[in-house]
Swiss-Prot record:
PANTHER family in alphabetical order: SERINE-RICH SINGLE-PASS MEMBRANE PROTEIN 1
UniProt source species: Homo sapiens
Protein name: Serine-rich single-pass membrane protein 1
Residue ranges with Polar residues bias: 96-114, 132-142
Keywords: Membrane, Transmembrane, Transmembrane helix
Lineage: Eukaryota, Metazoa, Chordata, Craniata, Vertebrata
Transmembrane segments: 35-55
Region (Disordered): 65-114, 126-191, 210-244
Ranges of compositional bias, category Basic and acidic residues: 80-94, 161-176
Length: 244
């Protein structure tokens, strides 16, 4: 029963009562004000996109025009240079039909411009500059390596001298003992030498004194005996002093 009633309702809906008014769609859109905002947003969106496209295309057109103008000026300059070179060649050499018949390929070649000649002349100069720069770099690297080696040698020498100075400032006990022994030996040697010198001087003085006094005393003995006695006395004194 429910299914039949639903089918009937879909085929023949119930009539709308007279008191209910049909709502106007335009009035509702105006009341909500949502349709107007959406439409204005879409309109301005398309306008902005169109303006951006126009400016982008205008910049592209301007760049193309500049390129065309530059290419036109370059072609005009090339043509003028070619014409001037042809005129110079025609002035330098007179026209000979036999030469043109013999050498048609040479006439077909385009004349050389000044820019091409400048490029050809600049190529060896560029090569020389590159070689010079490479040579300078190699010399600089060698100089840097030499300076580093010299600096390392200086640092090593400074380190060794610093170690030696430290060892001198802080001597070991063995070195102290050695120094003391050497000083003692030196002192003993100097004392012995001074004693020897003093004894020798005393012996000489005594000999002089004895010789002086022996000359003053009168003696009956002949001079040969006196000399022998003096020599024996001097030898005895020297022996005593040497034993002492």
């Amino acid at each position: 029963m429910g299914d039949l009633f639903s089918l009937f309702w879909e085929v023949d809906p119930p009539p709308i009562p007279v008191n209910c008014a049909i709502p106007n769609q335009d009035y509702e859109c105006w009341k909500d004000d949502s349709c107007g905002t959406i439409g204005s947003f879409l309109l301005w969106y398309f306008v902005i996109v169109f303006v951006l496209m126009f400016f982008s295309r205008a910049s592209v057109w301007m760049s193309e025009d500049k390129k065309d103008e530059g290419s036109g000026t370059s072609t005009s300059v090339r043509k003028a240079s070619k014409e001037t070179s042809c005129k110079r060649q025609s002035k330098d050499s007179a026209w000979d039909p036999s030469q043109t018949m013999k050498k048609p390929k040479q006439n077909q070649l385009t004349p050389v411009t000044n820019s091409e000649v400048a490029l050809v002349n600049a190529y060896p100069e560029q090569r020389r500059a590159r070689r010079q720069s490479q040579f300078n770099e190699v010399n600089q690297n060698q100089h840097d390596s030499d300076t580093t080696e010299y600096g390392s040698e200086e640092s090593n020498s400074e380190a060794s001298s610093w170690k030696e100075s430290e060892s001198e400032h802080h001597p070991s006990p063995d070195s102290i003992k050695r120094r003391k022994m050497a000083q003692r030996q030196r002192n003993l040697g100097s004392y012995q030498m001074s004693e020897r010198h003093c004894l020798h001087c005393k012996a000489l003085r005594t000999n002089e004194w004895l010789a002086h006094h022996s000359r003053q005393k009168p003696s009956v003995t002949p001079p040969m005996k006196r000399d022998s006695q003096e020599e024996s006395s001097i030898s005895d004194i020297n022996k005593k002093f040497s034993k002492f």
